[in-house]
């Protein structure tokens, strides 16, 4: 199964909000060159909430075609409507995704049994490796370790992206589930410690702008080389912090625009990063070697 630095890829857009297919192709090729280990297409960072069905499928299809034979692709196919999630997951399998990432249902706040039945229904409907995604800070819905344990026994539910940043939570899941159940961090700030504690990788926002260094940090942590991992992570920590100075993916898209890698487009209800926040992130990017010092 997939290990290492998995970029939660942005969906590049033009100023009018339309998908920028040329920039998308360039980003995928850049991640191959930079040593990224895998790509998540149309996750939260990819603005899944504001892409229509056809756009959602088209972005996944394009990323799969571009990455084929070079990088595994995990398709974001979660929804708070079980039938919608099944449809998106079926489409991703048809289009050749290697696995799917399924966020917990947001807004409708299902109980733990509802979460279990939701993910079980998707797994039974579509035979593709499926990764659970727990991010209660965004969804107001927390997938508890005992429910993860139950779901880990479903053959094609193969792992979880745990984005609480709670390392004790990660350790509990590790203890409850079999060794082949994959644990991915969804919190860049704690990802190094997460991997050193037995995790298998990081589904990363920071990897959008510093892919080579994120890949190297994850490789060192996976190899148990804590000193190298800590040294690399110390260089990345300012990005881990300031790429969340406003709601994700607002800062990371602005950073990529400053690097000349994408246009400035983002879809409502998100808006471009405020002018007040720009100097701080720009200075952090300069300190991290992402921009020329002027």
UniProtKB/Swiss-Prot annotation:
* E.C. numbers: 4.3.3.7
Where's it found, cell-wise? Cytoplasm
Q: Describe the reaction catalysed, as an equation.
A: L-aspartate 4-semialdehyde + pyruvate = (2S,4S)-4-hydroxy-2,3,4,5-tetrahydrodipicolinate + H2O + H(+)
* Site feature Part of a proton relay during catalysis, where: 44, 107
Q: Which SUPFAM superfamilies match?
A: Aldolase
Q: Extract the CDD domains matched here.
A: DHDPS
Query: Under what name is this protein listed?
Result: 4-hydroxy-tetrahydrodipicolinate synthase
Task: Name the gene for this chain.
Answer: dapA
């Amino acid at each position: 199964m997939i290990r290492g630095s998995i970029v939660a890829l942005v969906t590049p857009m033009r100023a009018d909000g339309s998908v920028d297919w040329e920039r998308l192709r360039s980003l995928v090729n850049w991640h191959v060159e930079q040593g990224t280990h895998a790509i998540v297409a149309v996750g939260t960072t990819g603005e899944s909430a504001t892409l229509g069905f056809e756009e959602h499928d088209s972005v996944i299809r394009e990323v799969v075609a571009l990455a084929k034979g070079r990088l595994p692709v995990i398709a974001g196919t979660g929804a708070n409507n079980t039938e919608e999630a099944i449809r998106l997951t079926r489409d991703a399998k048809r289009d050749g995704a290697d696995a799917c990432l399924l966020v917990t249902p947001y807004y409708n706040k299902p109980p733990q049994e509802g979460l279990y039945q939701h993910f079980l229904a998707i797994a039974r409907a579509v035979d593709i490796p499926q990764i659970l995604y727990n991010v209660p800070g965004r969804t107001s819905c927390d997938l508890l370790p005992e429910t993860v344990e139950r779901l880990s026994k479903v053959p094609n539910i193969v792992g979880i992206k745990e984005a609480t940043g709670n390392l004790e939570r990660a350790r509990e899941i590790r203890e409850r589930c079999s060794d082949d159940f994959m644990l991915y961090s969804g919190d860049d700030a704690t990802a190094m410690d997460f991997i050193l504690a037995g995790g298998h990788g990081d589904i990363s926002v920071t990897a959008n702008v510093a892919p080579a260094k994120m890949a190297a940090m994850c490789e060192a942590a996976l190899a148990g080389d804590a000193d190298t991992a800590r040294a690399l992570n110390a260089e990345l920590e300012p990005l881990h912090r300031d790429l969340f100075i406003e709601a994700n993916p607002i800062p990371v898209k602005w950073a990529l625009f400053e690097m000349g890698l994408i246009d400035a487009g983002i879809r409502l209800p998100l808006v471009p990063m405020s002018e007040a926040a720009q100097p701080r992130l720009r200075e952090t990017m300069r300190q991290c070697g992402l921009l020329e010092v002027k």
